[in-house]
């Protein structure tokens, strides 16, 4: 059996597709598994042993820029993909996505699997598009993204796993080693600090500077742990990913000695190297929070206004050492006591873990 799985979305979405790959490999060890990803999220699967081939297509739109050459490259790749004569093409993801359905239908697979049906963004023409699927599954908005992905394997004769299947990510050793060098330069020992992150697309999900200062002070006085502040570099109006420089600039020069700023370069894997050495981490809901959830220290993810934003039921960290807090409107509403209780829970978990998700953890 030859299977291709499409994942169009961002980094966190790709990480949450890894349990699907692991479960498929275990259930059908002889299957040939291909993954089709874009040039924004494909790196999450580098080194993943559960796929036989990773196809990467360039996005036509990158932030505010259009890349006409990407159209030509996608057409060339489509011709090569159709020659593979896949038995199944699956549009991974826990939502109804007409764009994903349209893309897998172009692949010429014998059977096509995706969620179909009601979606507030669907156009009237989408019903005809969904009708072309050989295996259109009804959308269940109560499931977590991981569970929704696993459910897409049922047309292949693969039942849902009995035990939880967790995401896995192989952070390359050079990033871990580079982070260790930076920590040494700051006089911070591995496992003796907590990461506080600002990275989020929406301001309502970010902790305030006052919260960051209070939390780091508590971690130092009560736990004897330093803190490392990580933020997204760049301007707030960046079309690829909004930056946090304007938030950090007013107080970066007056940080206390126990709060170290990590001037994260463009590649998020540099920040992940630091996270891999942390006792635990706090991040706003988003892709980096999911990556941090599979690090040795785990993560506390901060959610806000989930009546209009992704809900923890669908999007919480799906890992043994992942937990979350949910604020009515903004993360600034969260009490310090609630944050400290969650951090204590994470620190009570074992500080060293060996992941068994089918990919290397180092």
Where do the PLM segments sit?
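Catalytic machinery of carbohydrate-active enzymes
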Residues: 1-362
